Amino acid sequence: MEGLQRSTISFRRQGSSGIVFDDRLIAELNKSGNNEQKDESQRDEQPKPMSESSEQVKPIDEKDKLRPIKTGGGAPGGIERSRSNGGGAQRHHRTTGRVSPAVDPPSPRISSCGCCSAFGKNPPGKKVNPRKRPPKRRSRRRIVTKKR
């Protein structure tokens, strides 16, 4: 508990996960944990009645109580994997890595009433300069050739 930061405002300790621990609560939990350990040690010390067989019971070591966690992926009854979470057929090609998520496309411009379009902002791509005059239109002359 020494590793937790102590608040200057209240007499509580706060861990990195944001959970607030009260010192009284921690003291009660420690007491109840000590009581349970004492009960277990008393149970271990009590002599056990002999069973009908004449075999003596070996004391259980702590090493025998602990069992390793099985992490084998191919064991039956384990976690089944699909292609999306790393399982499936073996791939014999070179992978390029993960693909970055797609960027959301911009929302479409929907025209509404005239007031909204009159007072709305212009799209950022089109800048209108009121001082600039439109270019002059040139008429096309048609060259007419006489047919013979």
UniProtKB/Swiss-Prot annotation:
Protein name, as recorded: Uncharacterized protein At1g15400
Compositionally biased spans, kind Basic and acidic residues: 36-47, 58-67
Pfam families recorded: DUF4666
Keyword Hydrolase: no
Keywords from the named record: Phosphoprotein
Superkingdom, taxonomy of origin: Eukaryota
Disordered: annotated segments: 1-148
Polar residues compositional bias, start-end: 1-17
Keyword Phosphoprotein: yes
GO cellular component: nucleus; plasma membrane
Biased composition (Basic residues): 128-148
Phosphoserine, modified sites: S100, S107
